[in-house]
Regions:
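Methionine residue identity
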Residues: 84-87
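Amphipathic, hydrophobic secondary-structure cores in small proteins
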Residues: 32-56
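N-terminal acidic leader/helix
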Residues: 2-33
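Intrinsically disordered, low-complexity, basic-enriched segments
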Residues: 8-10, 21, 36-37, 50, ...
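Long, compositionally biased
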Residues: 51-81
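Long, hydrophobic, amphipathic alpha-helical segments used as structural scaffolds
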Residues: 27, 31, 35-38, 76-79
């Protein structure tokens, strides 16, 4: 039986990194934390980002990031928490 990872090419890997890093920037958290959310808390990386590469990579960055964050929320990842903390930090700095 072929392992799913056998068909990951450099395009898919580069796209996965692009998604992880841009989600991290939007949520103001580390790429490592986002990777854990997409692989350990959910399986979004292997079940959505990689298999849907052909469609997703044609969209703009904001659409991709917001789409994945919305899916993370649907899967129970507490993304809103990171957004709230960032907003509170910004309020205190202004």
């Amino acid at each position: 039986m072929e392992n799913k990872k056998d068909w990951y090419g450099s395009k898919e890997l580069e796209f996965a990194i692009f998604c992880i890093e841009n989600i991290a920037i939007k949520l103001n958290i580390s790429g490592q934390d986002v990777y854990k959310m997409l692989t350990e808390e959910t399986n979004i990386l292997n079940d959505y980002i990689i298999p849907c590469y052909e469609v997703l990579h044609t969209q703009d960055k904001n659409y991709i990031v917001n789409d994945i964050i919305e899916l993370m929320n649907e899967k129970g990842v507490k993304v809103w928490f990171y957004t709230m903390v960032l907003m509170l930090l910004l309020i205190n700095l202004i």
